[in-house]
């Protein structure tokens, strides 16, 4: 077992753990499970930090793969989905998840430029990134049969699905007010500006 292989395994597990933690944390924040116990800024900062950590760990994982002599990955193999000859499906999912992670994480820093709506839309990539990273780890990881690693995969998957169901349920249970109704309510009661005409005044 070489030092490169140890780094590959370790960085891969750390990267997945941080991706899972970032996804779970984001769902917990969006479902308002913290209430007002913690201010929004620290919650966002921690979410951001988890994403950055996952991005760095994934970068280390990819660099270590190009240095290992067992499979002999090249830069094209770790940067272009579907090119690698070893476990092509698993590696393609890993590469795609890396790009998804990069887009979601870096979107924090251009939020003011792209706007809240676009930023939220981009953030939906986080779910695909998590699923891709999970399948990549299961298919390509040499530690998949390890009880601790299996527990991490199963536990994170259950948490993400459970929190996602909770979020959808809460959104459906929250009544939405149409835009016109909100505008009318903000302006107060509407009165008829025309003067009252007594009945029979035209006779």
Describe the function of each predicted region.
Residues 1-203:
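Membrane-embedded alpha-helical bundles that constitute the cytochrome b-like, heme-associated redox core
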């Amino acid at each position: 077992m070489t030092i490169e292989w140890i780094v590959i395994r370790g960085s891969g597990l750390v990267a997945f753990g941080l991706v899972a933690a970032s996804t779970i944390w984001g769902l917990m924040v969006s479902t308002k499970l913290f209430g007002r116990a913690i201010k929004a800024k620290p919650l966002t900062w921690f979410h951001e930090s988890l994403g950055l950590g996952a991005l760095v760990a994934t970068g280390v994982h990819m660099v270590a793969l190009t240095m290992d002599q067992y499979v002999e990955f090249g830069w094209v193999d770790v940067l272009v989905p579907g090119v690698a000859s070893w476990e092509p499906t698993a590696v393609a999912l890993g590469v795609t998840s890396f790009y998804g992670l990069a887009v979601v994480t870096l979107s924090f820093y251009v939020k003011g430029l792209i706007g809240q709506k676009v930023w939220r839309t981009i953030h939906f990539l986080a779910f695909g990134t998590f699923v891709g990273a999970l399948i990549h780890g299961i298919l390509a990881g040499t530690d998949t049969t390890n009880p601790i690693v299996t527990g991490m995969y199963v536990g994170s998957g259950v948490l993400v699905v459970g929190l996602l169901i909770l979020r959808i349920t809460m959104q459906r249970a929250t009544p939405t007010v149409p835009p016109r109704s909100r505008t009318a309510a903000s302006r107060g009661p509407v009165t008829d500006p025309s003067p009252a005409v007594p009945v029979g005044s035209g006779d």
